């Protein structure tokens, strides 16, 4: 089973890439992390624990085409899956994001994929484009207009 999103944003590829791959931006729109878009880098994504899940997803960056594509493992919720973000110039300007999250197996994989489809949808439709817009308009030098996602769920940001 696969989770897939195809979205177009009216923001430059550089801003969308930064929103997806720079830990400072990821903390803003998603979760606490030490992510770096470098092949072989092992990282974590830390969210608020829920039920038996400790809130931590671990992964390793598999492939990077700087500014265009990053592919990494996702080890969380009892499943090992693979996520890919691919960016393309959009017709008429802006950036097209193709997100795929693949490798879900069995009934528990179906359940996890359903939950992640909801979560990814929320992020790619609202918070990610807001973050990319901020980066395109103001960069990292100007504080974001709202608290980071990591802060709103009570997660202390990493250095």
Where are these regions (language model features)?
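Hydrophobic ligand-binding cavity/cleft-lining segments
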Residues: 1-34, 153-159
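A conserved amphipathic terminal alpha-helix motif
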Residues: 103-159
